[in-house]
Regions:
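Histidine/acidic residue-rich metal-binding segments in metalloenzymes
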Residues: 2-8, 20-38, 46-88, 99-113, ...
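Divalent metal-coordination and catalytic microenvironments
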Residues: 39, 70, 92, 115, ...
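Short, electropositive alpha-helical surface patch
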Residues: 24-30, 166-172, 204-210
Length: 211
């Protein structure tokens, strides 16, 4: 409150471990359920498909947790489909590979499923070779609810400002693109509708003041 920053917590299962370990994490979280808004799936994606965790995600939903998962960053586009169809996630974390499948793009648009992209992390992990190759601009042009995030700033060289700045510089993003990215972030958030509207209105007012 002192810094006027609000937050919601997402607990993550580590995909390089087995589902049994994820169930242990779930059980450990239950006494603190009132503090946790959702569960996710992260760590090494290659060789660890979302389908490994169907049962624990189903049980997590039974406990009222919202569901998200890392998919389609280092792993194939099939992992995005698995996260959507098998884990029933409401958002895809990363999701860079979605553009490989036009039918998937249509699904994301129809269901208003957004992506949390981490450009500097993608560069550091060699998901992209250059920032100019990042897919976020094409995603925005297709109407996908793309957003920009920092992943693990201490490891990957940048907090939110650096990610926005380097992406905008590399892709020549204009003010409309930047405004849409900020609006998308609030649209995808788990804030109450009136709070979302308030923040989105502030974003629009700021960008309008620049004209």
């Amino acid at each position: 409150h002192e810094l006027k920053i609000s937050y919601k917590l997402i607990m993550s299962y580590l995909r390089h471990l087995c589902e049994k370990e994820a169930f242990k994490t779930l059980e450990s979280s239950l006494p603190y359920k009132h503090l946790i808004d959702g569960v996710g799936l992260d760590s090494s994606e290659k060789g660890n498909p979302p389908s490994k965790f169907i049962n624990v995600f189903k049980e997590s939903a039974n406990h009222g947790y919202k569901l998200v998962a890392h998919a389609g960053e280092e792993g194939p586009v099939d992992y995005i489909w698995e996260a959507l169809n098998l884990l029933k996630v409401v958002r895809i974390d990363h999701g860079n590979r979605c553009l490989d499948d036009e039918y998937l793009v249509q699904k994301l648009l129809e269901k208003k499923i957004g992506l949390t992209l981490c450009p500097l992390s993608n560069l550091e992990l060699k998901v992209i070779q250059r920032m100019e190759h990042h897919p976020v601009l094409e995603m925005l042009q297709k109407g996908i609810l793309a957003t920009i995030h920092s992943d693990d700033p201490a490891y990957f060289g940048g907090y939110m400002n650096e990610n926005y700045y380097e992406t905008a510089k590399a892709l020549n993003l204009n003010e409309e693109h930047l405004m849409q990215l900020a609006i998308n972030a609030f649209e995808l958030s788990w804030l109450r509708p009136k709070v979302k509207e308030k923040h989105i209105s502030q974003v629009k007012s700021y960008f309008n003041s620049l004209k």
